Regions:
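Short, small-residue-biased leader/transition segments that mark boundaries at the very start
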Residues: 1-7
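Phosphate/diphosphate ligand-binding glycine-rich loop within oxidoreductases
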Residues: 8-107
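Short internal alpha-helix immediately C-terminal to a glycine-rich phosphate-binding loop
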Residues: 98-124
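Short, conserved loop/helix-junction motifs that constitute active-site signature segments
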Residues: 115-117, 146, 245-254, 282
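Conserved anion/nucleotide-ligand pocket segment
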Residues: 121-156
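Rossmann-like adenosine-cofactor binding region
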Residues: 172-276
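Adenosine-phosphate binding glycine-rich loop
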Residues: 250-327
Length: 327
């Protein structure tokens, strides 16, 4: 994805790192190279490795864990002089860089982390003309926002459930921080008096499990049949959209609208989609601010993992008084 690559490039540039992109379709991975081989081969001179693997339920997070196990083994056996940091750029379970950027945005918007407790968040499904959007954003949001004492509602039509183990994490987080986590099948109920709304499409968890099995079996006809079924299922819920009327239900009619971008915008990018053009356009400035935090989140993850005393290092850089030079 073009914008995602630019964000990663920006994060690396911020730290003076040079980025190399591995396209598995053009590598030995496509010819049977194992995870253990790949992990060691790409790590000889690498300080940080970022992996994005979000398309197949049950595989993305597992791949990253297997990759890290191989790095540990390579470092322990003396193959690697250093063990690179792994940054999860997105997997089937979570999208940490996106969700932490979302969190940083709302911390700034509401004037501090201490002001988040008790804020109502509506993480809702929304209609899209496509069917296979990852579950990692809604799962990441309910897993992270409940850690800050917020009242999080996950809303979706019946059949669009997320991974049950992530729901359990959200429940435990809410109980530990004095917030709440609840589910419903009514978008209006979720939007009512919400301080923050995050309407976004995602694919049903069970259907994505089935799709993974079909791809593993090489069942093209089965994949095509599943796609038609899911598109038809989506079309039954076109009323799940962030409209002007829906926004009026939120707190004072002025809830903060979030989206990880790109959004399916009704009347602009598609005939019917996740959000009305007028709503999206009204929130364009805060949306771009939300997106702007992502390269800093990625850079911070790399910096914190690579620098032994990050606080001292940052203080020394601040004392130097050097500014970024523009040429």
């Amino acid at each position: 994805v073009g914008s995602e690559m630019c964000i990663r490039d920006s994060a690396c540039n911020l730290l003076g790192l040079e980025e190399q992109v591995l396209d598995e379709k053009k590598s030995q991975i496509a010819h049977g190279e194992t995870v253990r081989e790949t992990a060691n081969m790409v790590s000889f001179m690498a300080d940080v490795i970022g992996i994005r693997d979000d398309m197949f339920i049950g595989e993305g997070h597992k791949y990253q864990k297997t990759f890290m196990d191989a790095l540990e083994e390579g470092y322990r056996d003396g193959i690697l002089e250093q063990r690179p940091t792994l940054v999860n750029l997105q997997c089937d379970v979570d999208h940490p860089t996106q969700c932490m950027a979302d969190m940083l945005h709302i911390i700034h918007y509401f004037g501090g982390v201490e002001n988040l407790k008790g804020k109502k968040v509506a993480m809702t499904w929304a209609y899209s003309p496509s069917y296979g959007k990852p579950l990692s954003v809604p799962q990441g949001v309910i897993g992270l926002f409940t850690r800050f004492g917020m009242d999080v509602t996950l809303a979706h039509p019946e059949g669009y459930e997320v991974m049950p183990e992530v729901e359990e994490i959200a429940k435990k987080n809410a109980a530990a921080t004095g917030g709440s986590f609840k589910k419903c099948n009514d978008m209006k109920e979720a939007f009512k008096d919400a301080d923050i709304v995050y309407p976004k499409s995602w694919a049903p968890f069970k259907a994505m499990e089935e799709r993974t099995k079909l791809y593993q079996a090489g069942d093209k006809d089965g994949i095509d049949a599943l796609e038609k079924k899911l598109l038809a299922q989506n079309a039954e819920h076109k009323d799940w959209a962030c409209t002007e009327e829906m926004m009026k239900l939120t707190k004072d009619g002025k809830a903060l609208y979030l989206h990880c971008l790109p959004a399916d915008i009704t009347g602009l990018s598609c005939p019917e989609g996740e959000v009305d053009n007028s709503v999206f356009d009204r929130y364009i400035v805060p949306l771009y601010k939300q997106a702007s935090y992502k390269p800093y989140i990625i850079a911070a993850m790399m910096f914190l993992a690579q620098v032994k005393d990050p606080v001292r290092a940052l203080m020394e850089m601040d004392k130097s008084g050097e500014e970024r030079k523009m040429f």
